[in-house]
């Protein structure tokens, strides 16, 4: 793998995993526009992609480190019968993780095979953009509550939204922010809940494949560099996004980008052969 391509993929993963624009969709579409095909199950790429997932998860853990310490403390307090907001939120995050964990393990590879056509990925990106616009409309129409007041049923619903991101072109963070808006969270709190909810999912995606890092010792240097670059990009991304939504930023801005990018890619691959 060339150095420029390593840097490109690392930064692309770190940014698009957290921005509501579909990391998997971009990983497939952007290289294809330059005539390259990315097979994330290729043996030579697996160690590298494992490191990218771990880099993203570590960036999220570090950014929300104080929040996670409070959540874990509240969780153990709840086990001792002491009800508290942090413990309730931790249980909500656990419940929200269940749908994607189960569906992802059972169906992820099958779904990817069905949606391998880049024109379908581009169409999904367009739909993702429309949903982001609708999410803004929903958020402004709902009464607001803090994440600690989400019911477990609402947390499960938000977690269920992540399942849609198994389809390339749909964004995990985008879908969970929309679901959070529907549950009554403000834009910044929906973003925070989305990132907290996504951390164990992203971590698990890396940890499950971690042994493959050590089956390719000749690629460890590339994987380490990629992981570090992704962690930096992801940290800067989550920092920007939290400030953006705290400053009354809107999902519709990302929705417009997704629609325009999806239309461009759809038109491109209607008239150009897809790389194999």
From Swiss-Prot:
It comes from the Bacteria. GO terms for molecular function: undecaprenyl-diphosphatase activity. InterPro entries: UppP. It is an enzyme of class 3 (hydrolase). It catalyses: di-trans,octa-cis-undecaprenyl diphosphate + H2O = di-trans,octa-cis-undecaprenyl phosphate + phosphate + H(+). Its EC number is 3.6.1.27. The chain crosses the membrane at residues 1-21, 44-64, 87-107, 114-134, 150-170, 190-210, 222-242, 251-271. GO terms for biological process: cell wall organization; peptidoglycan biosynthetic process; regulation of cell shape; response to antibiotic. It is found in: Cell inner membrane. It is a multi-pass membrane protein. Bacitracin is thought to be involved in the inhibition of peptidoglycan synthesis by sequestering undecaprenyl diphosphate, thereby reducing the pool of lipid carrier available. Catalyzes the dephosphorylation of undecaprenyl diphosphate (UPP). Confers resistance to bacitracin. Belongs to the UppP family. This is Undecaprenyl-diphosphatase 1. It comes from Burkholderia pseudomallei (strain K96243). The lineage of its organism: Bacteria, Pseudomonadati, Pseudomonadota, Betaproteobacteria, Burkholderiales. The gene is uppP1.
């Amino acid at each position: 793998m060339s150095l420029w391509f390593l840097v490109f993929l690392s930064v692309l993963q770190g940014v698009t995993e957290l921005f509501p624009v579909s990391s998997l969709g971009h990983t497939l579409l952007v290289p294809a526009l330059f005539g390259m095909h990315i097979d994330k199950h290729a043996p030579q790429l697996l160690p590298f992609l494992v490191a990218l997932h771990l880099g993203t998860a570590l960036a999220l853990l570090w950014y929300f480190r104080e929040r996670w310490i409070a959540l874990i403390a509240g969780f153990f307090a709840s086990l001792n019968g002491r009800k508290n907001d942090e413990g309730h939120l931790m249980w909500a995050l656990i419940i929200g993780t269940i749908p994607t964990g189960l569906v992802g393990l059972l169906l992820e590879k099958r779904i990817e095979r069905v949606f391998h056509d880049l024109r379908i990925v581009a169409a999904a990106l367009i739909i993702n953009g429309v949903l982001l616009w609708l999410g803004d409309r929903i958020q402004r129409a709902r009464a607001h509550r803090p994440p600690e007041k989400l019911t477990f049923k609402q947390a499960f619903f938000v977690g269920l939204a992540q399942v849609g991101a198994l389809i390339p072109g749909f964004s995990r963070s985008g879908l969970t922010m929309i679901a959070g808006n529907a549950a009554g969270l403000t834009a910044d709190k929906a973003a925070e809940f989305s990132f907290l909810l996504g951390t164990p999912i992203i971590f698990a995606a890396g940890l499950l494949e971690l042994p493959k890092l050590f089956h390719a010792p000749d690629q460890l240097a590339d994987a380490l560099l990629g992981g570090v670059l992704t962690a930096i990009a992801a940290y800067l991304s989550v920092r920007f996004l939290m400030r953006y939504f705290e400053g009354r930023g809107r999902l519709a801005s990302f929705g417009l980008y997704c629609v325009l990018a999806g239309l461009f890619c759809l038109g491109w691959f209607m008239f150009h052969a897809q790389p194999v």
